[in-house]
Amino acid sequence: MDRREFIKSSAAAAACSAAGIAVPSSLSAAENQDGWRWDKSACRFCGTGCGIMVATKNGKIVAVKGDPLAPVNRGLNCIKGYFNAKIMYGEDRITKPLLRVNANGEFDKKGKFQEVSWKRAFDEMEKQFRKTYAELGPTGIGVFGSGQYTIQEGYAISKLIKGGFRSHNIDPNARHCMASAVVGFMQTFGIDEPAGCYDDIELTDTIVTWGANMAEMHPILWSRVSDRKLQNSDKVKVVNLSTYSTRTSNIADIEIIFTPHTDLAIWNYIAREIVYNHPEAIDEEFVKANCVFTTGPVDIGYGMRANIKHPKYLPSELDTAAKEKSTVLSENEGVTLAYLGMKAGDTLENKSTGAPDKHWIIQYEDFKKALAPYTLDFVAKLAKGDPNEDLEEFKKKLKALADLYIEKNRKVVSFWTMGMNQHTRGVWVNEQSYMVHFLLGKQAKPGSGAFSLTGQPSACGTAREVGTFSHRLPADMVVANPKHREITEKIWKIPAGTINPKPGAPYMKIMRDLEDGKVKFVWVHVNNPWQNSANANHWIKAAREMDNFIVVSDPYPGISAKVGDLILPTAMIYEKWGAYGNAERRTQHWRQQVLPVGDAMSDTWQYMEFAKRFKLKDFWGEVKVDGKLTLPNVLDKAVAMGYNPENTLFEVLFANKSAMKFSSDDKIMAGYDNTEVFGDSRNVVGSDGNVFKGYGFFVQKYLWEEYREFGLGHGHDLADFDTYHKVRGLRWPVVDGKETLWRFNTKYDVYAKKDNPNGDFSFYGNKNGALVTGDLAKATSKEKEALKSRAKIFFRPYMDPPEMPSKDYPLWLCTGRVLEHWHSGTMTMRVPELYRAVPEALCFMNEIDGNKFGIKQNDIIWVESRRGKVKARVDFRGRNKPAEGLIYVPWFDENVFINKVCLDATDPLSKQTDFKKCAVKIYKA
């Protein structure tokens, strides 16, 4: 071990020690590495996108370490990263399909799980799928997808569901984490994903975190922030805005604890400070050339059920549910909505729930007028989150925050994650971040920009770029656009008219439709929907007590697997080939390192095997979707294209002529397993009852090269498959082999330069866009004004959330993650070292509240809302330090099933759930 490796190992050991975790053996000392094969890969966990080096010997993973050549993490890992390999070897890893059966071996929803063959599993799955499709059509099936799909997995399942089955009822768990960011991007820029990159950290003077505990959720990025702060601590400033105190505050110059939901008001305060008190700070040249001012309706509801008296609601839920129809304006809303002629006590009827994304161009003077109420005095009283903090001190913090943004030559990066996205006005608050940066001309520049951080490893690369959302197609295209469907049908080589023009159900609607009997077949991939969805009691009851069939592809028996009817054992990250796309648009590929455990097979294999079970004639004839829409018969067109109605979906969508051009004799695979291509030495008996010998063509390369056709020449360009196996990722668009660091800036982005050769910026996502004009209340014209590659500066008001603390439920509840565990803990709770470090989810709370409710440190309490209750252990002294009036409970622990308590309200535009705020009471268990 050389000095460099020794230093890195020492740093890793220190990190483990600080977390109370045993050091991985591969880092504890220099080891004999004879016969080890090291290869680059990617970390399985968050959206940072760290590079990993994986060592194998004799078909086993013997070590993992940070990749010193990876520009993201530069050889470092967080504590989860060092245990990437161990997630694959939990004692209860599922190795064979499991089906609920009765004593006679027949499927029985009330039966017990029993090991079955792949053939038996697929036979039952096919039977149940056909039954549901015949009864309910394309809307009767549902797929819970993931921001943890590999890119090829997401592309394959989208092609099967959208192109083969003609359904769009597929939605990823990224709906829970990034949907508000996506809609914010699309509404503002006309194109998805951040303008900047991680290089901004080393170039900026100011890092402001909004609802982003980067120290735990993006720890490697936070190490880069810390390094930047230490380089010049006097000039570089860090501000942390949060609803409770976190580790991210440890290096912050300013910590601002605000009341949940009032980030909306704080952004407007900053904008008001710019517009009214520092108009000289407005970059008028930038704004005039590159922006238009816009607004939209406020009567949009809260993304709950339209039927406010739905029979499945508990009586205790009805008062919150009623706010979907109308709300009585509070004193604060009377101030913030005065520009619409409204006042406190007025009833706001939510008439725009059907078109919450509608918006129009307004004049700058309208924009300025709407900001008028957001004075320092008003916002400070509204937003101060710690009742025991002095109001004048809080005002000083808000003023200092605004001053940092406004300072003439100061570079500023605003980072956010779930605090802004998991929000019933998440799209609005995303748009507000761009509002401030645009006004100051501090966007799409090195070291300056509003930067949405992704939570999952491929929420960007798969869920967003591939388009596994219920309304999307690859490369930012949408299913409702006829031209986009036409492009997709041509690339997929399927008949015109095959793709359903009606978007499918988003994540929470699939759950609600399951409860209502409108969805009866669900397939779960790479996530844990029955643990990760708010108001979980409803959905568990629906899964177990109704006439439906739930398939869960999973390596472990998490909550979703336990409520399912069929569990399919799934290969994990280093047991398959794959690719992820991270938060800075960096795409990274890896090779299969080892064989899957037991009879587990990859998700891609499962999709392709399922596709073998169905023929074109089963779905490409006339298909009734609902009372208003019938899909056309496209079989004649298919025959004209050279297909036969007897062809399987596998033959047409996957094992087609184009796919066969990708040879199994490819040097990229030399010396590596590829189970999908060759089969493997396990001789797994596949879905047809025969030993699976491989597909005989380079599946992953074919899927990649077909997928990249969508983005070429359209600002989403990706490199070819082979290139990614030679580099440590590339940030798209990749044009002529060169990655793009700052989009929309003509110095760095060839698309911006092409669109505006004589200017500095082009927000070309809006090149062909147009909007009607109006005033603050409504659109007043019918004629549209061309956007001409200009971005939008939105005005969005503060409004209360649908549920706030009251006499009966006096506390705010916030949920989230912890450093040591990933999401629902299905993988990390099975790593002994991580489990020992944090074996249970605690209820972090302020001791003042403890004294108020007669609760002491380590007491077991009930946390109860209108929807349900759970037990948790109290911690007054832990890493998370809420102010009086708020508790924080992470959701990784299935024994502290906090999503039984949470409210399933969503942002009406993005359909993303707000996990960050609901009202609860606590008492001793």
UniProtKB/Swiss-Prot annotation:
Binding site for Mo-bis(molybdopterin guanine dinucleotide): 80, 148, 173, 177, 210-217, 418, 422, 528, 553-554, 576, 603, 815-824, 899, 916
Signal peptide: 1-30
Protein residues bound to [4Fe-4S] cluster: 43, 46, 50, 78
Cellular-component GO terms for this entry: membrane; nitrate reductase complex; periplasmic space
Enzyme Commission number(s) from the entry: 1.9.6.1
Record-linked Pfam families: Molybdop_Fe4S4 (PF04879), Molybdopterin (PF00384), Molydop_binding (PF01568)
Biological-process GO terms, alphabetical: Mo-molybdopterin cofactor biosynthetic process; nitrate assimilation
Cofactor binding, per record: Binds 1 [4Fe-4S] cluster.
Localization (cell): Periplasm
UniProt-listed CDD domains: MopB_CT_Nitrate-R-NapA-like
Cofactor(s) listed: [4Fe-4S] cluster; Mo-bis(molybdopterin guanine dinucleotide)
One term of GO molecular function: molybdopterin cofactor binding
Subunit structure: Component of the periplasmic nitrate reductase NapAB complex composed of NapA and NapB.
HAMAP family with a match to the protein in the record: Nitrate_reduct_NapA (MF_01630)
Name of the protein: Periplasmic nitrate reductase
Species of the source: Campylobacter fetus subsp. fetus (strain 82-40)
Record lineage: Bacteria, Pseudomonadati, Campylobacterota, Epsilonproteobacteria, Campylobacterales
